[in-house]
Amino acid sequence: MFEGVFPALITPFQRNHGKNLDLDGLRSNIAHLVAAGVHGVVPCGSTGESATLSFAEHEQVVEVTMDEAGGKVPVLAGTGSNNTSEALRFTRAAKDVGADGVLVISPYYNKPNRSGLIKHYTAIADLDIPVVVYNVPGRTGQNITPDIIAELAKHPNIVGVKEASGDLGQISTIIELTRDEDFAVISGDDNLTLPILSLGGKGVISVAANIYPRPLIEMYEAAQKGDYETAREIHFKYSPLFRAMFYESNPIPVKKAAEILGMAAGPLRLPLDEASEQTTERLKEVLSRYD
């Protein structure tokens, strides 16, 4: 179910005092992505500024995403927290509105031990909804090692991992250890998507696909056909864009790029701030290559 190109959706905000949700803008962005042919969407992830959404806003974003994309493409809702009871609450809410699955970041700051991690994910998976583990040690301060992923993959509801460690050796080991399970290893880094696909990965949860979905889709489709020459050409053409998405902390650059391209984006919520003037000019230069 969770294979292909899944944009990690930005959450548009209004440029008012409260920086309220721009739900019409969210709908417009989702409709554009679905029409472009994405294989699924991910609301309320890191790119969606989930850390600064209230519980009610989190519910609203998932509900609107389901209303706009549900039945057209799978919706994988971000429901992670460093508090297991809160992650369970987010997950129940996503399940109640019909999300196809949930993306659950590993608990950040707490640094749980092995048994704590396994119990955390097991409690969420026991809610009887497909769970994709999200490993991003650069944000959480802790790496989920391949042996832990392999153990989690034995749970029938833990169906994949979004791997954003940046370590191809580790990712290769995870694919090796989970080959006998119905388990998807998904890239969490646009620039590593092609190498991960070549190892047997199943797709990407993408930042860049918010603004340029078609190249990612075409690269994925070429790789699926074994046409790695075409896939490499696309990869190298868009690598500058992939790198540009991290000129500053995600999602600062992608929201600015979306704004430049006329999409709904709006401001960021503190502690994230607007892209610097230098970043904005660098983004404009990179985007101009793809006009």
Swiss-Prot record:
Reactions catalysed according to its record: L-aspartate 4-semialdehyde + pyruvate = (2S,4S)-4-hydroxy-2,3,4,5-tetrahydrodipicolinate + H2O + H(+)
Subcellular location: Cytoplasm
GO molecular function list: 2-dehydro-3-deoxy-phosphogluconate aldolase activity; 4-hydroxy-tetrahydrodipicolinate synthase activity
Keywords of the record: Amino-acid biosynthesis, Cytoplasm, Diaminopimelate biosynthesis, Lyase, Lysine biosynthesis, Schiff base
InterPro entries given in the database record: Aldolase_TIM, DapA, DapA-like, Schiff_base-form_aldolases_AS, Schiff_base-form_aldolases_CS
EC number: 4.3.3.7
Pathway annotation: Amino-acid biosynthesis; L-lysine biosynthesis via DAP pathway; (S)-tetrahydrodipicolinate from L-aspartate: step 3/4
GO biological process: diaminopimelate biosynthetic process; lysine biosynthetic process via diaminopimelate
Enzyme class of the recorded protein, top EC level: lyase
Chief location: cytoplasm
UniProt keyword Cytoplasm, yes or no: yes
Function: Catalyzes the condensation of (S)-aspartate-beta-semialdehyde [(S)-ASA] and pyruvate to 4-hydroxy-tetrahydrodipicolinate (HTPA).
Similarity comment: family membership: Belongs to the DapA family.
PANTHER family xrefs: 4-HYDROXY-2-OXOGLUTARATE ALDOLASE, MITOCHONDRIAL, DIHYDRODIPICOLINATE SYNTHASE
Protein name: 4-hydroxy-tetrahydrodipicolinate synthase
Organism: Methanospirillum hungatei JF-1 (strain ATCC 27890 / DSM 864 / NBRC 100397 / JF-1)
Gene name tied to this protein: dapA
